Amino acid sequence: MSRKKEQQLRKYGTLVVLFIFQVQIFGFDVDNRPTTDVCSTHTILPGPKGDDGEKGDRGEVGKQGKVGPKGPKGNKGTVGDVGDQGMLGKIGPIGGKGDKGAKGISGVSGKKGKAGTVCDCGRYRRVVGQLNINVARLNTSIKFVKNVIAGIRETDEKFYYIVKEEKNYREALMHCRDRGGTLAMPKDEVTNALLADYISSSGLFRAFIGLNDMEKEGQFVYADSSPLQNYSNWKDGEPHDSTGHEDCVEMLSTGEWNDSECQVTIYFICEFLKKRK
């Protein structure tokens, strides 16, 4: 056998031995399947843990999982954009009356009118003047009647009415006469008590009555010029004319009489006769 062939045989023998040795160490057969130990008298231990391999490719998407539990309430989001205008709703009820508006701007002046005819207005002015006087009297009478309706007192023969307008004695006397009456004249105790209660219940303290001594000091006469005779109800110490000008008489809410200055302005009581049927 040549030397060259010996070397080849030795080489192949060495390779076979190494192969068998590897099989014993790793315990795998040619098909990479586990095999039984070559020698039952030897225990083959696992080798050390190898290094981590390279990261594999991304796998396919898995199946959808089950619905999880409801999460906590999130924060309030930002206000969205204004939506489209909705459909027109039903007409609502009529609202209350509004406040009066501000005064508007003055309009444009109108065209100048045509000249009027010449008028003899003198007689018309007189008629208009008299009408104004009559209207003023009528308004005064209407006002008086309205006040009378509000409350009066009466006896079998007369009506009595407190006029709540402050006037002096002469003005009060004329006011009553212009309306067909006169200032009240309490000539007996019953009438005096009626007028006193009238003054008191009206919330007043005093009022003029139709009694005075303007003609002669100390001699009192009624508004109809009849003298003071059988009945009087002077307050203690009255009349005393303390100022020298107390020539008219007022009745107090107590029913007592007091002489007073005629120029003071106070409420007064008118007296009217009842019409006989």
UniProtKB/Swiss-Prot annotation:
Gene3D superfamilies in the cross-refs: Mannose-Binding Protein A, subunit A
Stretch forming the signal peptide: 1-27
CDD domains: CLECT_collectin_like
Signal as UniProt keyword: yes
GO molecular function: D-mannose binding
InterPro entries assigned to the protein according to its UniProt record, in alphabetical order: C-type_lectin-like, C-type_lectin-like/link_sf, C-type_lectin_CS, CLec_Tetranectin-domain, Collagen, Collectin_CTLD, CTDL_fold
Location in the cell: Secreted; Golgi apparatus; Cytoplasm
Low complexity: compositionally biased ranges: 64-79
Chain intervals for the UniProt region annotation (Disordered): 41-82
Residue ranges constituting the Collagen-like domain according to the UniProt record: 56-115
Biased composition (Basic and acidic residues): 49-63
Family stated for the protein in its record: Belongs to the COLEC10/COLEC11 family.
Identification of the protein by name: Collectin-10
